[in-house]
Amino acid sequence: MNTLTKLGLMISLLCGTSLTQASDIAARTADMAGAELRPSDSVQIRNKQFGDLLRPEDANRADGTPIVLYPAQPWKCMTWKLLSAGDATFCLQNHFTSKTIAPAPASEGTNPPVKQTALPQNAAEQPAWIFTKLPDGSYKIAAAKSGETLTAVPGARGGSPQIVIAPWQNREAQKWEVRKIDPRTLTM
């Protein structure tokens, strides 16, 4: 029994469930944690350096909203549905805004910010991200068009860390933990 399964079992027992129910919950938690990513999965994406989750700034629904990191909450704005765009390649659809993310045009700087944008109806036009599992279990998430990687950088004036795309340098700021989550458990 791995640590995650034990933790799920302990939490379930503390919440007053029966041993059978607790075992079932622990098994489902372990299954979700160890499974490969698939289209239609709902996930939260945590940056390894900062420990926070990917979301649109201030949970704003507007196109052009910067993508930032925020402390973990069971909120729809921090949860993404994986839409198939090829082998280990996905378009991310936010559960709260129903929009996706894409790098801003290169004219916005050397490491363009990642911003929220409307989800194109034509799948071929949807921004795609390649998820590459690393030896430590985290993921490198790269823009399919440029190959540049989602990277967290400190926010201006002490604000939330901002998300940009940058060449891969194997830094913690470029590594992401992807955890499946049941969207029925989300609030807001």
What are the residue ranges of the model-derived segments?
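Lectin-like carbohydrate-binding module/patch detector with strong preference for beta-trefoil
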Residues: 23-188
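Bacterial N-terminal signal peptides that target proteins for export
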Residues: 1-8
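Sec/Tat signal peptide C-region and signal peptidase I cleavage site
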Residues: 18-21
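Bacterial N-terminal signal peptides
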Residues: 8-16
